[in-house]
Amino acid sequence: MQLYNKLSAEERARIIDENSQERITLSFYKYFNLGNPTLFRDHLFIVWSNIDVLGRIYVAHEGINAQLSVPKENIDKFKKSISEITPLNEIRLNIALEHYSKSFLKLTIKIRDKIVADGLNENTFDVTKIGEHLDAQRFNQMLDDKNTICIDMRNHYESEIGFFKGAIKPDVDTFRESLEVIDRELEKNGKEKNYLMYCTGGIRCEKASAYLKHKGIKNVFQLEGGIIEYTRQVNENNLKNNFLGKNFVFDERRGERISDDIVSNCHQCGNPCDSHINCINESCHLLFIQCKDCREKMNSCCSNECMEIIKLSYDEQKSLRKGKHNSNKIFKKGRSPKLKFKIN
């Protein structure tokens, strides 16, 4: 039985284009006790491969975290495959606000120690004792309460392009660093405040709220379904939208437009912009914000150095990449030497 991708991303993209295939981008997560992650992973790969599901899925003893792209014509088959797994049979699917047929180009299901890399030792507190989930309307009400401390549980590059009004946006690279920010807020504001948290789809707030409960905080709240579900409820129920800008997403779209506000700037020229791009130089692949003008001037590169590298032959570029590991390279303003140049 084939348990890995037979097609490259480029081949898959071509097939999607040729078939004019309409696909739905969605995500879900679930914390539950999984005895055999390997068996579960292989089962999912077989079932989902047969209905052309693509995406990035993490499986661990603690559950599943999935971001997927499903052919519209197969969405009922996909839902049936989920319903046949007891812990997942009533799970909410976070449907993307904007659909892009090539949001994912491979089906990747990986076994991990955890479904979110949180750096926590769960033996020190009960992860099932979490905060109260709020829908969009109640979240808005809590956000307006002067006794509320709202914390964005995402990383700096996510909150840079979009956030809730009045939220604390930690300048962090990891979830574990966000918890250190929570500790500082507790020390500064005390335990009697309302602590309100949000993230993309809700998964990071689950453990963060359990962490706060462990710290002895009574008034702990989290946004049900994250920014994705919040926006759906706002649109369907004609509620006030308190989110400014884009919601960063971890697929080829890089973001969903929530409001018309542009709250960030091009990392090269400083003009208003909220479009992330990976440097086209494969030996770099830096994630940063680049406007249309700079993209044209810089040939989708992050630096003059990378512009020179992409002029080399394929073999020369491949030789430069040998032995280098470039995953998770993300620009952080003031910390990256790559972007210390000025476009005239």
Model-derived segments and spans:
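Rhodanese-like catalytic fold shared by cysteine-dependent sulfurtransferases
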Residues: 2-132, 155-195, 203-344
